[in-house]
Amino acid sequence: MMLLASLFTVVALLSGCAGTAGTPGAAASSPARRTPVRIATLKGPTGVGMVHLMQAQDAGTTANDYAFAVTAAPEDVVAKVATGDVDIAAVPTNLAAVLNAKTSGAVQMLAVNTLGVMYIVTDGVPLAGMADLKGRTIHASGQGSNPEYVLRFLLERNGLDPDTDVHIVWKSEHDEVATLVAGGDAEVALLPEPFVTAVTVKNPELAVELDLTTEWTKAVTDGSQLMMGGVIARRDFVEQHPDAVAAFLTEYAASIEAAKTDAETTSALCEQYGIIPSAAVAKQALPRLNLTFLAGEDMLAGLQGYFRVLYDADPKAVGGSLPDAGFYYTTR
């Protein structure tokens, strides 16, 4: 139990998904005067793709002059964007939509950086797909938020009634669910990374049976994707500094690619910059973080369907209304 407690202490901060460490800075030539850009990022999967750019900034090789703020609280990022204290922020995509609504369109979605990070973990229950959950008890957290909306949507798309065909036991925190499944007190659990890594390290008998990102792709026909993390910018900053925004996107794409291809360096940088407190946990979690870089039409096609699912479940999940076309930054 001491090991389990220490693992969960590490990961509890995180939930709220080819190159080298120098790749982001090398991707663009430095202008005569580097534009100051203030960036806020959340700890956990949403911030992992930023770490190589942070290292390049420390080395002085970036096109822009970046100042980074790392926080565990989404509300802190929202406040900084709303007050103009940051120019660019890495946040959950639905939070971006909410912030867009609250600020009357004062932010734009630049790119998606993370697909889904939610998984079905089981203790001796093999699953070929969502339909195999019929008759099962699922332990989960996140009732009234994205985990519930996504789970119910996927169950329904696979012919199951979430209220009668399965029994969902809602817990208040991810670590409660993790403790149950790791201790053998839950056969089926819905968990995000890096909690998935924590429980499978504690109990090697557990199996990661379903990736909800994959299950989403199998369930939809509209081209949407489970897109859970992205980067936004203040609209006035985009309009005043288009070249700086374009340079950021180029360097950020390179940073994400480096994070996907160099696990050793990435995990060390995650610990160094406080994105994930343990390099060991980061390294094991990386393959399931579903890091990506999708911008322009690719971002638009994937996000609109995802937002529609959230809106149909609860309009407040995306700020009360679906974002209009102006929310999506589509010029690079």
Language model: regions and residue ranges:
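Short, low-complexity disordered leader/linker segments with a strong preference
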Residues: 1-36
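Extracytoplasmic/secreted envelope proteins and their assembly/folding machinery
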Residues: 47-51, 78, 82, 93-96, ...
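Short, solvent-exposed loop/beta-turn-alpha elements that line the ligand-binding surface or hinge
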Residues: 57-64, 213-224, 291-299
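Pocket-lining segment of extracytoplasmic ligand-binding domains
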Residues: 94-95, 103, 169, 175-269
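Short, surface-exposed acidic
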Residues: 162-166, 274-285, 318-324
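Secondary-structure end/capping motifs
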Residues: 238-313
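Conserved C-terminal helix/tail region of periplasmic/extracytoplasmic solute-binding proteins
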Residues: 304-332
